[in-house]
Structure formats: C-alpha cells, structure tokens
Amino acid sequence: MAATAPKAGGSAPEAAGSAEAPLQYSLLLQYLVGDKRQPRLLEPGSLGGIPSPAKSEEQKMIERAMESCAFKAVLACVGGFVLGGAFGIFTAGIDTNVGFDPKDPYRTPTAKEVLKDMGQRGMSYAKNFAIVGAMFSCTECLVESYRGKSDWKNSVISGCITGGAIGFRAGVKAGAIGCGGFAAFSAAIDYYLR
C-alpha cells in the first residue's frame, strides 16, 4: 500500500480520507490544562532518566514525616544545640576572664574551674541557639504551609515573628526592634543563599 501524495491545493488530512474526524484543539486543551486534566505519574525512565521502581507506602510515610514541620523544628533544635554549644565553648576558650574570681584577682584559676565555666557558657549558648533555631524553623514551615509558596518572604515573615517573640520579653520596643532586626538578617541570609 503506497501512500498517495496530496493534491496541489489540498491539505494532508483531506488527502488521507474523510473518515478521520478533524482534531479539536479545545477538546485537547481540556485534557491538557482544563477541567478534565488528571494528575500524571512522571516516571524518570519516560523522561530520559534512570527508571526507578514506584515508592512503597513506608517510603512515602518516611518522606511525609521528614517533610513535616515538627521534624524540621526538632532537626533545627538539635543542630542549634550542637552549634551553640560549640560556639559557647569557643568563645569561652578565647575569653581571658574564664574562671576569674573577682574577689581574688591575683589567683590563677585551676583547670577544673576553667572547664566548669566553659561548660556553663557552652550549655547556655546551646540552649539559646536551640530555642531560636526551633522557633525559626517551625515558624518558617508554618508560614510556608499557610502561604503555599516557597520564597524569600517566608523567611522574612518568620524572622519577624521569631525576633519579635524573643524581643517582647524585654518590652514592646525591644520586640519591634527584634522583629525588624531578625527579619532583615533573614532577608540578607536568604538573598545570599538564593
């Protein structure tokens, strides 16, 4: 069966025969972007990538748990605790007044007193960093969930909320300054990282 060439002045669909219905673009658009659109499972193999098996229910459950606001807050709390503890020990290590007794300024502090002071400062910094990290992370996740977008505004809003909540312990003015300062810092960090 040889294909016949279309007549001069005729189009290819007409040459193929009148048995085929013309393509209705409005109907096609309904299935692609309209009301009849259905979610598609995009397999990496069909897109030119390495094919992978479908995810099991356990994998989906673990992904949902790791993407939850509670998990992100706990992760930021633990990370803040470790980072704050290291920062506190570092600052205590370079401070010349560690273990210093104001009652007896000429006495050299013992290693036990210096280590005790370093541990106290490290624990204090660790707790503060953990609280700030958990507050900021949880607030940012909740703002992102509420807005439905992931952009720089989320970190600015959550920075303002976190800074304001921390600052309001010292008064309204301190809360406003904390809100503005933490929001500006969050915006600068987000601008630098993105």
Swiss-Prot record:
Keywords: Disulfide bond, Membrane, Mitochondrion, Mitochondrion inner membrane, Protein transport, Translocation, Transmembrane, Transmembrane helix, Transport
Compartment(s) where it occurs, according to its Swiss-Prot or TrEMBL record: Mitochondrion inner membrane
Post-translational modification: Disulfide bonds promote efficient assembly of the TIM22 complex.
Disulphide-bonded residues: C69-C141, C160-C179
A GO CC annotation given for this chain: mitochondrion
GO biological process: protein insertion into mitochondrial inner membrane
Residues annotated as transmembrane: 74-94, 123-143, 170-190
Record InterPro entries: TIM22 (IPR039175)
Record carries keyword Mitochondrion: yes
Subunit details: Component of the TIM22 complex, whose core is composed of TIMM22, associated with peripheral protein FXC1/TIMM10B and the 70 kDa heterohexamer. In most cases, the 70 kDa complex is composed of TIMM9 and TIMM10 (TIMM10A or TIMM10B). A small fraction of the 70 kDa complex is composed of TIMM8 (TIMM8A/DDP1 or TIMM8B/DDP2) and TIMM13. The TIM22 complex also contains AGK and TIMM29. Interacts directly with TIMM9, TIMM10A and FXC1/TIMM10B. Interacts (when oxidized) with TIMM29; interaction is direct.
Reported function: Essential core component of the TIM22 complex, a complex that mediates the import and insertion of multi-pass transmembrane proteins into the mitochondrial inner membrane. In the TIM22 complex, it constitutes the voltage-activated and signal-gated channel. Forms a twin-pore translocase that uses the membrane potential as external driving force in 2 voltage-dependent steps.
Similarity comment: Belongs to the Tim17/Tim22/Tim23 family.
Protein name, entry field: Mitochondrial import inner membrane translocase subunit Tim22
